[in-house]
Amino acid sequence: MNIGFDAKRLFFNFTGLGNYSRDLVRNLNAFFPEHSLHLYSPKINDTDRTREFLYSLTYQVHRTKNPLKSYWRTFGMGKDLVRDQIDIYHGLSHELPFNFPKEVKSVVTIHDLIFEKFPQQYAWADRQIYRKKFTHSCEIADRVVAISEATKKDLIEIYQVPEEKISVIYQSCAEIFYEKADEETQEKTRIKYKLPKDYLLYVGSIIERKNLLNIVKAIHLIPPDQQMPLVVVGEGKKYADKVKNYIHQNGLENLIHFLAQIDFADLPAIYQMATLFIYPSLYEGFGIPVIEALASGTPVITSSVSSLPEAGGPDSHYVDPNSIEELKKALEDLPANQAHLTSMYKKGEDYVKKFDREKVTREMVELYESLL
């Protein structure tokens, strides 16, 4: 098959949507090399991570000479897909071009409907644009991929997408999270980032929906002799300032460690050295940091809402994300129970096999083949 991909997020996004795009294309190249992969992007972002990604793959990149690059991605790409004899075009992050050619089969991945569930966090104009793009893509796609049963449920309830048109295909995480860092690597990483000996870990964007402030408030309520430092890997703007103001006002600077910029290759060791991974998000399409933690052998505390129980499995610890008291109790009780933590991480490592790279990639290839 000649498979085309919307690769803008692959080259320019280094969190959830970009990771999904890179992992799928990388896995297709590794496990199904007989297929020809075509990456369509208005331009390429020249960074260490994109260079490493491109040098490791067999692929073709297609760009436009049109100065209106966003116009090409939304309206002008169709004729290029026909020219390149693309069999399947996959919109990896919610979008398919308008004027899509009938000669080409189409798949779109919908990660979440966050802007519909939390409209107060988005500008009115942005919501209208997103809704137009999402509904158009769901309408014209030959198949809609939802990354969780929770997202499938939202698509049916909010956009009335026919259930039979939706396929739930989970995502995997990068292979490096399954590789155990040796003691020397862990210690070098600890020194490099000035990490405490024992710590709690949060990885993700620092935005309101991710709920970092409630973690900090819960830690603040724990008696000082039981408090464990929190390492935060991620960046943010206004909400991050709000969190940092709370930390400053309550004298918690020595307990909360922010790592805004890290080398991606160091992230597995940071997960592996953590006592617990904490992710009490209010809503996720899937929650890839949860399976990164499980693959790394780190026990997880996460929310009992949206897709997070799908990602965390039966042996992660679940809390009401709005209950600071529940989170406080978990952060007090779990670190003190080493036997339970050991059971959690062993069962978590077994559960995360559900998201095996080859398995989920095979499911996607089978979906592509079913459309031809």
Language-model-detected regions and their locations in the chain:
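Carbohydrate transferase catalytic cores enriched for Leloir-type hexosyltransferases
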Residues: 1-372
